[in-house]
Amino acid sequence: MMKQIWKNLWSQRAQNVWLFAELVVVCFVAWTQIDPIAVRLFYQNQPAGFDIDRLVVADARLYKTMGQNIYDHDGDEYYQQMSEQFTREMKQLKQHLLELDEVAYVSFLDAIEGYPRMNKSYWEIPLPNDTIGIDVPWCFYNIEEDFFETFGIQPIPGSPSQHELSMNSGGGQNLIITRSLAERIYGSAEAAIGKNLDSGSTYGDGTGNKYPIIYTIRGVVEDVGARTDEYSTWMAFCPNGHLSYNQSKARLVIRLKPGVNMTRFVEEQTYRTGELASEHFVICSFVPYVDAPKNMDSFDSPDFNAQSDYDFNLSVATAIFFLINLCLGVIGTFWMQTKRRTEESGIMRAFGATKRRIMGLFLAEGFVLTTLSMFITCILYLNYVKTGLGKLCIPSSTQPDPTWVADKPLHFLIISGIVYLIILLTVSIGILIPSWNIVRTKPVEALREE
């Protein structure tokens, strides 16, 4: 059959040259569009390491003025007074939420971009017995607020329990790190517990003397994903002693009980947001944790995650638009090319060829053209990358990436395979539908039409 395929391709070389050139261009463009999307989707679908599917973020806003602006007052007394009032009201909101039947735990968020799966805060930690440091995502949480229970972050065997880590009686001098970070620094997760860690920062005593800030590793937890756009399981959790006072807004993260429908919970609570209020604050929205960066600005700066998601969605929409048009063009070209072969189909039917054999022959010719064009595209793209005109989509993660994304040969093969399958499916559609129509035509009618 291969001999017949090559013979047919050569006999129609004038048309096939244009088909081949079109396929090379389409494969090349598809490669550039699919690569970043495939990488981002891969990272987004990596295990979160905590109960992300049961988390909801509640956004609380100031609806009645709470005192005067703190910047209009000198000294710390007024700020302390307002902070205490703010803390009381946040605890009232937390209690309102805990009274809901669907809610298991509630904790506070100080900054939306500093938490698992949406982290943008990094701190360089010096490595023991080394001159270099590593950049680690940091998360600041409020002690005595059920942080680890709410997120469902699990301690490793031998580490203090979730409740003990959330209480963290040692305050800001204690640190909780993930298993992979502990193994990177100390070689073993279990060996990290109780060790001291130099933060790389110093503090002064007011006389010009500087002292290093030393943390004690209070506990080690299982790996959690710090971000959704790169491989990142290193993470450090640093306790704060109190809520950060904000004059206009606050956020609480809610962990639902097992079996609760999150979509229904969000819809139901959205209709009764005005009922969940303290003296000056009211909860005005509920958003699934995974969607929080897209729907809320951060406390102190524009939400980088929201911008990242916007850019990604824009690139996906652009890629889909171009790929659909390119694929429709390929389908149309092969469709017309196949319909022109009605006479050839009639002759083969007259000589005893079956419908299945004719369709298989046409399809095999398309597969050969697609395979050759993909092979040429791979050579062109390798040179495209080698010359510096383009590059593989490999995020510059602070942590070594063990996945296929950072393995350049494997990365290239996987993306090439995805592109090849998409183009193969497109070509198959452009051949199978018209070929099915022409093989059902009787040989006499097929020859009469020609």
Predicted regions: what they are:
Residues Q269-F312, P402-W404:
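A cross-kingdom feature of multi-pass membrane systems that activates on extracytoplasmic/periplasmic
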Residues M2-N8, R40-Y43, I414-E450:
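C-terminal membrane-exit region of the final transmembrane helix in multipass inner-membrane proteins
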Residues K3-K7, L328-G366, R440-E450:
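Intracellular coupling helices
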Residues G133-M235:
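Hydrophobic secondary-structure segments that place a key small or acidic residue at a functional site
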Residues F86-R88, N142, S201-C284:
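Small-residue transmembrane helix packing/gating motifs
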Residues I34-I134, G388-P402, K408:
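Membrane-proximal extracellular/periplasmic loop immediately following the first transmembrane helix
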Residues R13-A38, Q307-E343, V368-L380, L425, ...:
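Hydrophobic alpha-helical transmembrane segments of multi-pass inner-membrane transport and secretion
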Residues E343-L389, I418, I422, T426:
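Transmembrane alpha-helical interface segments in multi-pass membrane proteins
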